[in-house]
From Swiss-Prot:
Subcellular localization, as worded in the UniProt entry: Cell membrane; Endosome membrane
Segments on the Extracellular side according to the record's topology features: 1-19, 79-92, 158-188, 284-290
Major localisation: membrane
Glycosylation positions in this chain: 7
Function text: G-protein coupled receptor for 5-hydroxytryptamine (serotonin), a biogenic hormone that functions as a neurotransmitter, a hormone and a mitogen. Ligand binding causes a conformation change that triggers signaling via guanine nucleotide-binding proteins (G proteins) and modulates the activity of downstream effectors. HTR4 is coupled to G(s) G alpha proteins and mediates activation of adenylate cyclase activity.
Similarity-based family: Belongs to the G-protein coupled receptor 1 family.
Name of the encoding gene: Htr4
Domain notes: Specificity for G(s) G alpha proteins is determined by the length of transmembrane regions 5 and 6 (TM5 and TM6).
Protein name: 5-hydroxytryptamine receptor 4
Length: 388
């Protein structure tokens, strides 16, 4: 009898340690998501240069969606995991599930819009980009990112369309742990699984892959063009022309920006693809996927909500500078230098019948100087820059 009591006590102690470790991990994930996404939103609101970049409107809206996930969805899921019971009633379970689907879908829609914005900026002429990405169109795209997901979240879930034909399976799953506790179980039938997964993940993912492929091809073509210009300049003059130097810089800037967004998209797909693949497969194998696998894949997706801000900090120079200014209490070292002194008119130069002049601020020997640069006619170079 004493041996049995000792085993029971040992198991309870092990479970207590497990719960402490699990709670600590989930708390770190939630806190990281809240603080990181708040930092992104504050950075864009305070930094005038970040507000001028149209892509950042989508990034702020994406950060807001991730912030809502970390505040309205993740804490209740963490409490359910630690306490091994859902104590908030069936109606709030439906609301929480609807918010989960809504915000997850909104996140990937935002990433799709960001990829389309970068496609028009890098692969099209500047005039085409300005005509395509007008303030009205940006507002409509942002509205669509929030409104369209409601048709696969609140509407079908509140109406119970997702559980038609599988109510008995759901009831068994709710009480599978013990007779005195229930879980907030979200299971879907075959029609809803296919519709939700295709709309929320597979179609946007395909659009993003196509957009970034075209960006990669365009960047490669312009890299070859600039290399040819540099070789031609080297044969005629020993010193590289400002046009070639600035064109190369702008091309590299846009290419790095595209790579940054590709990394963000890749991390999103890595985090959410296992869930969406399982979501579409499970109904066709009689719901035999273990609950532990579902939970692991779901929280892998939640981790993405706290991952994007750190990707911006490490891969984007403008965001990194804005973060440092906020965290270091407006330290003057991290602020952009103003252009001081009187400006001298820049001389114009004609290349292939087109005249282009640009004044820029550069660092030279620890001092900031205003200089003139010649810009090349290129859809990649002329696209709206993302400072990386």
């Amino acid at each position: 009898m004493d041996k049995l009591d000792a085993n029971v006590s040992s198991n309870e102690g092990f479970r207590s340690v497990e719960k402490v470790v699990l709670l600590t991990f989930l708390a770190v994930v939630i806190l990281m998501a809240i603080l990181g996404n708040l930092l992104v939103m504050v950075a864009v609101c305070r930094d005038r240069q970040l507000r001028k970049i149209k892509t950042n409107y989508f990034i702020v809206s994406l950060a807001f969606a991730d912030l809502l996930v970390s505040v309205l969805v993740m804490p209740f899921g963490a409490i359910e995991l630690v306490q091994d019971i859902w104590a908030y009633g069936e109606m709030f379970c439906l609301v929480r599930t609807s918010l989960d689907v809504l915000l997850t879908t909104a996140s990937i829609f935002h990433l799709c819009c960001i990829s389309l914005d970068r496609y028009y900026a890098i692969c099209c002429q500047p005039l085409v980009y300005r005509n395509k990405m007008t303030p009205l169109r940006i507002a409509l795209m942002l509205g669509g990112c929030w409104v369209l997901p409601m048709f696969i979240s609140f509407l079908p879930i509140m109406q119970g369309w997702n559980n038609i034909g599988i109510v008995d399976v759901i009831e068994k799953r709710k009480f599978s742990h013990n007779s005195n506790s229930t879980w907030c179980v979200f299971m879907v039938n075959k029609p809803y699984a296919i519709t939700c997964s295709v709309v929320a993940f597979y179609i946007p993912f395909l659009l993003m892959v196509l957009a970034y492929y075209r960006i990669y091809v365009t960047a490669k073509e312009h890299a070859q063009q600039i290399q040819m210009l540099q070789r031609a300049g080297a044969t005629s003059e020993s010193r590289p022309q400002p046009a070639d130097q600035h064109s190369t810089h702008r091309m590299r800037t846009e290419t790095k920006a595209a790579k940054t967004l590709c990394v963000i998209m890749g991390c999103f797909c890595f985090c959410w693809a296992p869930f969406f693949v399982t979501n579409i497969v499970d109904p066709f194998i009689d719901y035999t996927v273990p609950e532990q696998v579902w939970t692991a894949f779901l929280w892998l997706g939640y981790i993405n909500s706290g991952l994007n801000p750190f990707l911006y900090a490490f891969l984007n120079k403008s965001f990194r500078r804005a973060f440092l200014i906020i965290l270091c209490c407006d330290d003057e070292r991290y602020k952009r230098p103003p252009i001081l002194g009187q400006t001298v008119p820049c001389s114009t130069t004609t290349i292939n019948g087109s005249t282009h002049v640009l004044r820029d601020t550069v660092e030279c020997g620890g001092q900031w100087e205003s200089r003139c640069h010649l810009t090349a006619t290129s859809p990649l170079v002329a696209a709206q820059p993302s400072d990386t």
